[in-house]
Regions:
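Non-heme di-metal
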Residues: 1-146
């Protein structure tokens, strides 16, 4: 018998708690800031993958995966900034949320544990992003909702 769980169900189980409704409302009401923040997150994800490439250059399996991730995240960055340009949203400074920085404080010292922790943190950040976009997608116009 096949499981009827969706990928989103699995993400919610992984995260253990859902994004507060207040965050959802703020994101819907301030889509310009949402787009700027999203562009920053895509750029940071690519940068984090590049840092792993530099730090763990002897790990060929990791190099291949991170290389693909850099390209994917930069393509997303291009897509978001193209939407911003079309909507005449200036790419202004928006401070980063504490979410990722607080998670990074938990990274253990030591090469083996540090890599594992960084990959797990990346998974949490990506899962949270997916969960949040699934919540706001019904409220966004077609260009952003897809």
């Amino acid at each position: 018998m096949q499981s009827s769980k969706t990928a989103l169900d699995e993400i919610k189980e992984f995260l253990l708690c859902e994004t507060p409704e207040e965050w959802i409302q703020a994101a819907i009401e301030h889509q310009d800031i949402l787009l700027i923040d999203h562009a920053n997150c895509e750029k940071k994800a690519a940068s984090s993958a590049m840092q792993l490439i530099h730090r763990y250059s002897e790990n060929y399996n990791l190099l291949q995966k991170m290389s693909r991730l850099v390209r994917e995240e930069m393509r997303h960055f291009e897509q978001v900034t193209a939407i911003m340009k079309k909507r005449k949203i200036n790419y202004i400074y928006v401070s980063a949320s504490r979410y990722a920085s607080e998670l990074r404080k938990l990274v253990r010292k030591g090469e083996a544990t540090q890599l594992v922790d960084l990959l797990i943190i990346g998974a949490f950040i990506e899962a949270r992003s997916c969960e949040r976009f699934s919540k706001i997608a019904p409220w966004l116009d077609e260009a952003l909702g897809n």
